[in-house]
């Protein structure tokens, strides 16, 4: 139990694992999983650890997925990319722009690996992965069987996919297929992007604006450990939203296609005057209330207590109960984040 997980999670929480293995191809990943499983150990497959909170020491093997490679197929209507799960997401965004293949610019600077992107259906500034995903290649861990799911079969939802449900723990993502249409259409619905002129804007300008918004609002994990947005933006019924807006008319709200309404968790937290609030070594970030940071050698229990406090305060004021976006990892695998902080 002496392999530190601190370098393998962006929160910088110091817990240990029994074994840590880096897998650079599918076979190494399968071998590591099968060996650990035969020993009766739990196994956790990790990308860059940018969306996890380790609650305690992990009693098993952590496999770091470092399967690399980018293949490009140039078709008349679009560029098709086949990207290894271990590639860094932001580096991929930069690479596609440099190569004149726009479409990912709204998703710039999202931390983590390409293989993690479908699990959460990552999204930012009006674009989600499902907009550009063609397929996801995974491997069934017990049999080594390769499975390709179309974007539809991935059952993407808000920060959700089949990989959080039926496919969790049984399959490992090894590659993601992306489709970037040659007829580029900017998405300028959020934040500073609304100020850009859709008739003249370039992909590089969108990329620059997104990077500027993220770097000014979000803490650098190398300075203050964090896992990005700690909570999901709550999606509520139209009735709930109407009641809330009659009391708080300035509350940011985003009507969804199905009639529900997405609220801004950061705004709700901010209204409770929680920016800068600290418990132990964990704090609510002063610029972006949606982010909890490791201010000073935080322990996982500091983060859990702080998240509980934030959830309670928002729930009491707005009757909206936040759910963590970050995944909570216990001694033998993922546990319910909502139950942990309730």
From Swiss-Prot:
Its EC number is 1.3.1.98. It is found in: Cytoplasm. Residues 13-183 form the FAD-binding PCMH-type domain. The active site is at residues 159, 229, 325. GO terms for cellular component: cytoplasm; cytosol. PROSITE patterns: FAD_PCMH (PS51387). Pathway: Cell wall biogenesis; peptidoglycan biosynthesis. GO terms for molecular function: FAD binding; flavin adenine dinucleotide binding; UDP-N-acetylmuramate dehydrogenase activity. Its main location: cytoplasm. The keyword RNA-binding does not apply. Its cofactor is FAD. One of its GO terms (biological process) is cell wall organization. Transmembrane segments: none annotated. It catalyses: UDP-N-acetyl-alpha-D-muramate + NADP(+) = UDP-N-acetyl-3-O-(1-carboxyvinyl)-alpha-D-glucosamine + NADPH + H(+). Substrate binds at residue 190. Keywords: Cell cycle, Cell division, Cell shape, Cell wall biogenesis/degradation, Cytoplasm, FAD, Flavoprotein, NADP, Oxidoreductase, Peptidoglycan synthesis. The keyword Flavoprotein applies. Cell wall formation. Belongs to the MurB family. Monomer. This is UDP-N-acetylenolpyruvoylglucosamine reductase.
């Amino acid at each position: 139990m002496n392999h530190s997980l601190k370098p393998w999670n962006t929160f910088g929480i110091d817990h240990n694992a029994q074994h840590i293995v880096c897998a650079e191809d599918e076979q190494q990943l399968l071998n590591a999983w099968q060996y650990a499983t035969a020993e009766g150990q739990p196994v956790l497959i990790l990308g860059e650890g940018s969306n996890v909170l380790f609650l305690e020491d992990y009693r098993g093997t952590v496999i770091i997925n470092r399967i690399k490679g980018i293949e490009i197929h140039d078709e008349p209507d679009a560029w098709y990319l086949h990207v290894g799960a271990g590639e860094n997401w932001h580096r991929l965004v930069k690479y596609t722009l440099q190569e004149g293949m726009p479409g990912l610019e709204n998703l710039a600077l999202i931390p983590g690996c390409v293989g993690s992107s479908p699990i959460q259906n990552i999204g930012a500034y009006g674009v989600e992965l499902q907009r550009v995903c063609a397929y996801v290649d995974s491997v069934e861990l017990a049999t080594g069987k390769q499975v390709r799911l179309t974007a539809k079969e991935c059952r993407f939802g808000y920060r959700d996919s089949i990989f959080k449900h039926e496919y969790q723990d049984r399959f490992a993502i090894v590659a993601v297929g992306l489709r970037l249409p040659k007829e580029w259409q900017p998405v300028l619905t959020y934040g500073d992007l609304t100020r850009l002129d859709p008739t003249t804007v370039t992909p590089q300008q969108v990329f620059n604006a997104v990077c500027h918004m993220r770097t000014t609002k979000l803490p650098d994990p190398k300075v203050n450990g964090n896992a990005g947005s700690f909570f999901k933006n709550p999606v509520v019924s139209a009735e709930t939203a109407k009641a809330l807006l009659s009391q708080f008319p300035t509350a940011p709200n985003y009507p969804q296609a199905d009639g529900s309404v997405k609220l801004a968790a950061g705004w709700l937290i901010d209204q409770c005057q929680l920016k800068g609030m600290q418990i132990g070594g964990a704090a609510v970030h002063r610029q972006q209330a949606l982010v909890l940071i490791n201010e000073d050698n935080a322990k996982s229990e500091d983060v859990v207590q702080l998240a509980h406090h934030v959830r309670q305060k928002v729930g009491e004021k707005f009757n909206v109960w936040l759910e963590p976006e970050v995944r909570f990892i216990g001694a033998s695998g993922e546990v319910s984040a909502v139950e942990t902080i309730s």
